[in-house]
Structure formats: C-alpha cells, structure tokens
Amino acid sequence: MSSWILLAHAETSGFGLNLDLFETNLINLAIIIGLLVYAGRGFLGNLLSNRRAAIEAEIREVEEKLASSAQALSQAQTQLKEAEAEAARLLVEAKARAAAVRQEILDKAAADVERLKATAAQDVSTEQQRVLDELRRYAVAQALSRVETQLSQQLDEAAQQRLIDRSLATL
C-alpha cells in the first residue's frame, strides 16, 4: 500500500527529485557500472586494441599501395615520355624517307620521260627512214618503168642487139 501512497503523492506533487539512495537504486547502479568497467576493461581494451591493429594494418597496406602506385605512375610517365620521343623520332624519319622516296620517284619519272622522248624520236627517225626508202624504191621503180617503156618504143631489134653487144664488151 505504501507504494500506492507514494504514487499518489508523486502524482500530486508533480515532478520531483528522489534523493533516497536505497529507493532509487543508485548504489546498485554504481556497483553494476563499476563491475562493468572493471570486467569490461579487458574485453573492451582487447576489442579496441584489435580494432586499432586492424586499422593500422589497413593504413600500412594503403600506404604501401600508394607508394607502389606512385612508383608505377612514375614508370608509366617515363615510358610515356620515351614513347613520345620515339614517336617524334619515327615521324622525322618517316618525313625524311617520304621526301627521299618522293625525290626518287620524281627523278625516275623524269628519266622515264626522257627515255620516252628518245624512243619517240628514234621511232620518228626510223619511220622517216622507212618512208624515204619506200619513196626511193617507188621512184626507182617508176624510173625503170619509164625507161623500159621508152626503150621499147625507141629501140628496134637491131639497136637492142647493138646495146647488148656493147654492154657485154664493157664487161
């Protein structure tokens, strides 16, 4: 019943602070908290120590990865610079080779043009010589044809015999 009275009294008085140590269980709470601190210190210490060791190991691992990554980056940058230098050198060589090949092609084309001109001139000269030879043969054939015609008209049988005899005598 006394708890009913206290409850009724607490309701009527409003909010208040109970300073009775035995009723508020402060001693029990202090003992429990003390035991938790004493007993939990080792457990909590181990837990925090393990967590700290794990974090330190992760930090060391990350620092090692950072160092190896920085080294790999440095090597990659060096290789990039070397590759760029090699590409520039190859470009210069390619341009020089292209210029040399271009000049070689131009020289060969000029030589081919000169050779074609010489061949064409020789072909023209040969054709001219052939035409002249043909014209000479034609002229000789025409002249012989006229001579035969004239000889047959002007020479009779006796004149032909005298001509043959004279030709034989000169031989």
From Swiss-Prot:
The chain crosses the membrane at residues 26-48. Pfam families: ATP-synt_B. It is found in: Cellular thylakoid membrane. Gene3D superfamilies: F1F0 ATP synthase subunit B, membrane domain. GO terms for cellular component: plasma membrane-derived thylakoid membrane; proton-transporting ATP synthase complex. It is a single-pass membrane protein. InterPro entries: ATP_synth_B-like_membr_sf, ATP_synth_b/b'su_bac/chlpt. One of its GO terms (molecular function) is proton-transporting ATP synthase activity, rotational mechanism. It comes from the Bacteria. Its main location: membrane. CDD domains: ATP-synt_Fo_b. The keyword Transferase does not apply. The keyword Ion transport applies. Keywords: ATP synthesis, CF(0), Hydrogen ion transport, Ion transport, Membrane, Thylakoid, Transmembrane, Transmembrane helix, Transport. PANTHER family: ATP SYNTHASE SUBUNIT B, CHLOROPLASTIC. F(1)F(0) ATP synthase produces ATP from ADP in the presence of a proton or sodium gradient. F-type ATPases consist of two structural domains, F(1) containing the extramembraneous catalytic core and F(0) containing the membrane proton channel, linked together by a central stalk and a peripheral stalk. During catalysis, ATP synthesis in the catalytic domain of F(1) is coupled via a rotary mechanism of the central stalk subunits to proton translocation. Belongs to the ATPase B chain family. F-type ATPases have 2 components, F(1) - the catalytic core - and F(0) - the membrane proton channel. F(1) has five subunits: alpha(3), beta(3), gamma(1), delta(1), epsilon(1). F(0) has four main subunits: a(1), b(1), b'(1) and c(10-14). The alpha and beta chains form an alternating ring which encloses part of the gamma chain. F(1) is attached to F(0) by a central stalk formed by the gamma and epsilon chains, while a peripheral stalk is formed by the delta, b and b' chains. This is ATP synthase subunit b. The lineage of its organism: Bacteria, Bacillati, Cyanobacteriota, Cyanophyceae, Synechococcales.
